[in-house]
């Protein structure tokens, strides 16, 4: 399944200067537990925001046409959109950002996992998602955020 996962403010903010403007350990723990032992795909800017360090205990794939897979294969690089969709038919693949990648894959997503912070933060990049094509299946409530789980209506 193709799953998009992100965290946003109440008004859809997702970053400031290519960084998260918040640190909420409980939300990071949720992200880690959800994506652990799976393939994650991110854009080059998201990878750069992580100081080009792959995330532990996950297969890191960078969606880019200008990067190459390093010799040590600490991460992989692709720009094959169709291959990502084909692979997602066989296993869970998480798109973790950034916004351009979310925009590209949103229409093909089987599942959206959206953490919504219970506060506003200063952001310069915002998610604008039309949830009309998705069903809200479940919510997990935490002290500082709510996780909304959506499924694509076309999948039902």
Curated annotation (Swiss-Prot):
What top-tier enzyme class does this entry carry?
oxidoreductase
Residue stretches making up the DHFR domain: 1-156
* Matching Pfam families: DHFR_1
Look up the record and report any one GO term of the cellular component aspect.
cytosol
Q: Does the keyword Oxidoreductase apply?
A: yes
Q: Name one GO biological process term.
A: tetrahydrofolate biosynthetic process
> One GO molecular-function annotation for this sequence?
dihydrofolate reductase activity
- Write the Enzyme Commission number(s) for this entry: 1.5.1.3
What InterPro entries does its record include? Answer: DHFR, DHFR-like_dom_sf, DHFR_dom
Q: Which UniProt keywords apply?
A: NADP, One-carbon metabolism, Oxidoreductase
Gene3D superfamilies registered for this protein in UniProt: Dihydrofolate Reductase, subunit A
Pathway this chain belongs to? Cofactor biosynthesis; tetrahydrofolate biosynthesis; 5,6,7,8-tetrahydrofolate from 7,8-dihydrofolate: step 1/1
What CDD domains would the database entry show? DHFR (cd00209)
Q: Which cysteines are joined by disulfide bonds?
A: none
Q: Which reaction does it catalyse?
A: (6S)-5,6,7,8-tetrahydrofolate + NADP(+) = 7,8-dihydrofolate + NADPH + H(+)
Protein function: Key enzyme in folate metabolism. Catalyzes an essential reaction for de novo glycine and purine synthesis, and for DNA precursor synthesis.
> What family is it from?
Belongs to the dihydrofolate reductase family.
What this protein is called in its record is Dihydrofolate reductase
Whose protein is this, by species? Ureaplasma parvum serovar 3 (strain ATCC 700970)
Q: Top-down, what is the taxonomic lineage of the species of origin?
A: Bacteria, Bacillati, Mycoplasmatota, Mycoplasmoidales, Mycoplasmoidaceae
